[in-house]
C-alpha cells in the first residue's frame, strides 16, 4: 500500500475498522474547513486575485519559500518581492487589480500538526451514528461523524485562513 501524501494510515490498534478512505475523508474535511492543505510541507502553485495593492495574500499560514511569482503573465524577479511566513507577499511594483492576476510557486505547510490526531479521531467516528439531543420539539446534534467536536474546532481554528481580499 502506498502511503498517502498526508502520511496517515490505519493502525492495527485503532478502535473499530478505520479504513484509508475514512482517514482520507477526515483529512479532506479538515483541509476544506481550513481553506488550505495544512500539512505536510509541499511545493504548490497557487493563483490568487489582487485588489491592486502591493500586498498579496497567499492561501497559507506557513510560507517557507517563494520559488517564483508571475503577475499578469510576467515573471517577477524574486529580489522584487518580500514575503512573510504568514503568507503575505509584498511586490515592489503594484499589480493590476483583478481576478487570477498573481500565480506563485511556493513551499508551504507544517511538517507535523495536532490536526493529524484530530483526523484519526474523526476517521474512527466515521461509522458511528449521528448523535442528537432532543428537548421538547427541538432536536440538535452533529449531522454526521465527520463533523469535528467542539474541542477539535478550537484546534482547527488555529489553522484556518481568514477572509481573503
What name fits each language-model region?
Residues 1-165:
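Divalent metal-cofactor coordination and adjacent catalytic microenvironments
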